């Protein structure tokens, strides 16, 4: 029988090993045996906790998206009374947190995006993550802009975030946070500059 309290430790080991394996060989070539060997456990342990490779991949994606939520929430928490611009920039920086832009995480996200088109469960997780980003951005822009303008601004900023992240992931170079800050700040200020006080309510 597994020791009491070992489940969270084992799950963490296996998720970390999955990220490491994907980083080296990609999601398609990653095998249960490789992941188990990297985690220092038997393949049966993976079956015990996750049933199969798809279950482990889903758990890994859930873990990455949880880290993303936590990174954004941690940056927003002290900014309850801050300006819309400051809060939007905090959301941007949360999306570019170290947990999201290190090599293994970036390769995992790329593979998950590709796999989500063919695996319904991963597809659902991807849609939830994308909708969460859009709704969070739209709510912040709505503080300053009419509803439709806020939605367009949110779509634009979400696309900019994804585009900056994707270009960095495909380049194989370290993520340039300063460049990302500059470009997203310019976009946010351009959108908010179009706000007129009498237009904020519809």
UniProtKB/Swiss-Prot annotation:
Pathway: Amine and polyamine biosynthesis; betaine biosynthesis via choline pathway [regulation]. It comes from the Bacteria. GO terms for molecular function: DNA-binding transcription factor activity; transcription cis-regulatory region binding. It holds the Pfam family TetR_N. Residues 8-68 form the HTH tetR-type domain. SUPFAM superfamilies: Homeodomain-like, Tetracyclin repressor-like, C-terminal domain. PROSITE patterns: HTH_TETR_1 (PS01081), HTH_TETR_2 (PS50977). Keywords: DNA-binding, Repressor, Transcription, Transcription regulation. GO terms for biological process: glycine betaine biosynthetic process from choline; negative regulation of DNA-templated transcription. The keyword Lipid metabolism does not apply. Coiled coil: none annotated. Residues 31-50 bind DNA. Gene3D superfamilies: Tetracycline Repressor, domain 2 (1.10.357.10). Repressor involved in the biosynthesis of the osmoprotectant glycine betaine. It represses transcription of the choline transporter BetT and the genes of BetAB involved in the synthesis of glycine betaine. This is HTH-type transcriptional regulator BetI. It comes from Cronobacter sakazakii (strain ATCC BAA-894) (Enterobacter sakazakii).
């Amino acid at each position: 029988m597994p020791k009491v309290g070992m489940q969270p430790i084992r799950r963490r080991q296996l998720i970390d090993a999955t990220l490491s394996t994907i980083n080296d060989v990609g999601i398609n070539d990653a095998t249960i045996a490789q992941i188990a060997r990297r985690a220092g456990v038997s393949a049966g342990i993976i079956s015990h906790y996750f049933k199969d490779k798809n279950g482990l991949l889903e758990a890994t994606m859930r873990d990455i998206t949880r880290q993303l939520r936590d990174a954004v929430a941690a940056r927003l928490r002290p900014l309850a009374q801050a300006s819309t611009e400051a809060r939007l920039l905090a959301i941007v920086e949360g999306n570019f947190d170290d947990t999201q832009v290190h090599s293994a995480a970036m390769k995992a996200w790329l593979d998950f995006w590709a796999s989500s088109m063919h695996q319904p469960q991963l597809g659902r997780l991807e849609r939830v993550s994308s909708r969460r980003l859009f709704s969070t951005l739209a709510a912040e822009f709505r503080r300053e802009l009419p509803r439709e303008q806020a939605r367009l601004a949110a779509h634009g900023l979400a696309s900019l975030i994804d585009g900056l992240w994707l270009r960095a992931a495909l380049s194989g170079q370290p993520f340039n946070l300063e460049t990302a800050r500059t470009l997203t700040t310019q976009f946010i200020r351009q959108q908010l500059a179009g706000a007129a006080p009498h237009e904020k309510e519809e």
